[in-house]
Swiss-Prot record:
This is Ribosomal RNA large subunit methyltransferase G. Its main location: cytoplasm. CDD domains: AdoMet_MTases. GO terms for molecular function: 23S rRNA (guanine(1835)-N(2))-methyltransferase activity. Specifically methylates the guanine in position 1835 (m2G1835) of 23S rRNA. The lineage of its organism: Bacteria, Pseudomonadati, Pseudomonadota, Gammaproteobacteria, Vibrionales.
Length: 382
């Protein structure tokens, strides 16, 4: 896998995070190259400009522009933030200010660079923040694959930010040029709230949380199969999203300590709010933005609930699910359980059988779209 980004007689060594022995995916894409090429060839920026970068996947843009400018990188991804930091260190770059999506968007920038997020609600939210924080003179340059930039995408820019135009395609990517000059911009609420049908659960979702305006079918199916057990002293919701599984687990197991983990800062904050509103602040809850279960002690949990993602940023991949399963096995107590839901076509049962042993994996429930699997950590497992 290529790890060296070479442009304008300069080379950066860039790697994805977490680092894998046989990495198949690159830490940057042609969109990163397109933005670098445009800024270097067309903008003629003087040194020491203040640049805001949104959604830098693994720090390619932050590493590049930090050489001559004052860079702030804002992201909703703990993994992207940690990957950016590692690449900055790897290339001995100048300091970059790293901030999360749940912090207030800073002001006073000369240029904004943006990787367009997959989630349209997140896009609208970020554009609204830019409209409120940036001057009309500040250029805002966004990038995505050409096939992902539709007329509706440009309408979102115009509705929430201001005047917008696009570039020609280059290496299957296009740039979007905009300014914060809309006179009557649309507005979007910071969060969406709703109640779960047939459950005593009220939910709030911040903009980048999966299934933002209703409960997704997989989570609804999983709610029906969360166990009740007085011995469950510590339950981990791995990839917690808005925390709906944690809320249900806490309702069913009032003595259990609940830990919500996600790599999305907005997901973690949604889960925090939802557990505290539905169950009160007196319960033992913990909320962590993390790369899976990094740093957790061995034999520290009795049950792990897991609804794995099958993408990282724009890339479709199953390595996150595998890492989640491996981490869960490591931190489970003897006879502890991993409860997993996934689409039937993802074949999670094969992965779990390899990891836990075929005799320790059971199908708990299934329907035409989803399957719920239980993997038990055997008494003799390491």
């Amino acid at each position: 896998m290529k790890t060296e980004l070479c442009l304008f007689d300069r080379t950066l060594n860039l790697q994805r995070y977490p680092k894998r022995a046989q990495e198949l995916l690159q830490a940057w894409d042609a969109g990163d190259e397109f933005i670098i090429k445009h800024v270097e060839e067309e903008l003629n920026l003087e040194d020491n400009k203040n640049i805001l970068i949104l959604n830098d996947n693994f720090g390619a843009l932050s590493c590049w522009f930090s050489e001559k400018h004052n860079v702030t990188m804002m992201t909703d991804s703990f993994v992207s933030q940690r990957g950016t930091l590692k690449n900055l260190q790897r290339n001995q770059c100048n300091r970059v200010q790293l901030i999360s999506s749940t912090e207030e968007m800073p002001e006073g920038f000369d240029l904004v660079i943006m990787q367009i997020p997959k989630n349209n609600r997140m896009l609208a939210w970020q554009l609204q923040q830019l409209r409120q924080s940036m001057t009309a003179e500040c250029p805002i340059i966004a990038v995505n694959k050409a096939k992902e930039i539709h007329s509706s995408t440009l309408e979102v820019f115009e509705d929430y930010l201001g005047e917008t135009k696009t570039s020609l395609a280059w290496k299957k990517h296009r740039l979007v040029f905009s300014n914060a000059n809309a006179t009557n911009p649309l507005t979007i609420a910071e969060a969406v709230c709703w109640s779960v049908d047939n459950e005593d659960i009220d939910l709030l979702n911040y903009p980048n949380v999966y299934s933002g305006e209703r409960l997704d079918q997989g989570a609804r199916f999983m709610l029906e199969h969360i166990p009740v057990d007085a011995e469950l002293r510590h339950i981990i919701d791995l990839g917690c999203g808005n925390g709906v599984l944690s809320v249900k687990a806490a309702q069913l197991n009032p003595e259990a300590r609940i830990t919500c983990i996600d790599e999305s800062f907005m997901a973690v904050e949604s889960a925090r709010r939802n557990l505290e509103v539905n169950l009160g602040k007196e319960r033992q809850f913990q909320f962590i933005a993390n790369n899976c279960l990094d740093g957790f002690k061995k034999h520290s949990s009795y049950l792990v609930l897991c609804n794995p993602p099958f993408h990282q940023g724009q890339a479709v991949t199953d390595h996150i699910a595998w890492q989640m399963f491996c981490d869960a096995k490591h931190i489970l107590c003897k006879e502890g359980k991993l409860l997993v839901i996934g689409n039937r076509h993802l074949d999670y049962d094969d992965k779990l059988c390899r990891l836990f042993g075929e005799e320790n994996v059971t199908t708990i429930a299934s329907n035409s779209k989803f399957v719920i699997l239980e993997a038990v950590k055997a008494e003799k497992s390491k």
